[in-house]
C-alpha cells in the first residue's frame, strides 16, 4: 500500500479504532512508541503528546526518523523492543501499531509484552493494535516476517505478564488492545 494511502488509513481508521474513547493524552506525559517504522503513526500522534520516545529495531528507519524528528518532542532510539535500554517504570504510557506481526515467534512477542510492562509506570496505559491473520496479508509479507498475534489469546498473555483492565476488541481487519500495568 502506498504511503499516502496507508497514512490516510492510519489517520481515519486505525488510530481511532485503537484508541476508542480515549485520547492520545490519556497515555500521559512520557510515552513510548514501539516499532514506529518510518514514523507515520509518530507523525499523527506526536502533536497530542508532551514527550514521545520511539524505539525502532531497523537502523536505517531509526536514523531517518531521528533526523526527521530532530528539534521536536520525539526522541528516537535504535533498539530491540524485547530488550529495551530504558529504566523500569519510566513511561506513563506505551503504544504500538501494526507491529506485532513482524515479531518472529510467540515467545518473542511475549518477551516484548513483558518489556513493555517493565518500562511502564504502575497504572501506565498500553494501547496496541494489529491486523488479524489473513491470506491477503500473508501474501504481502512474502519476503518479510509474518507472525500474526491471535487476539483470542492476548488477554491471557497480558494477564500472565501482569497487566490488568485488559480490553480487547476485534473487527474484520484487526484487533485493538488497551491494558494497564497493575499498580
Where are these regions (language model features)?
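Class I SAM-dependent transferase core
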Residues: 1-11
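Conserved alpha-helix/loop element of class I SAM-dependent methyltransferases that forms part
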Residues: 9-29
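Class I SAM-dependent methyltransferase SAM/SAH-binding core
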Residues: 32, 37-83
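A conserved beta-strand element that flanks and buttresses the S-adenosyl-L-methionine
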Residues: 95
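Short catalytic micro-motifs in class I SAM-dependent methyltransferases
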Residues: 98-102
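A short glycine-rich, Lys/Arg-flanked "PGG" loop and its adjoining helix->strand segment in the class I
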Residues: 110-122
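C-terminal alpha-helical "lid/dimerization" subdomain adjacent to the S-adenosyl-L-methionine
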Residues: 125-178
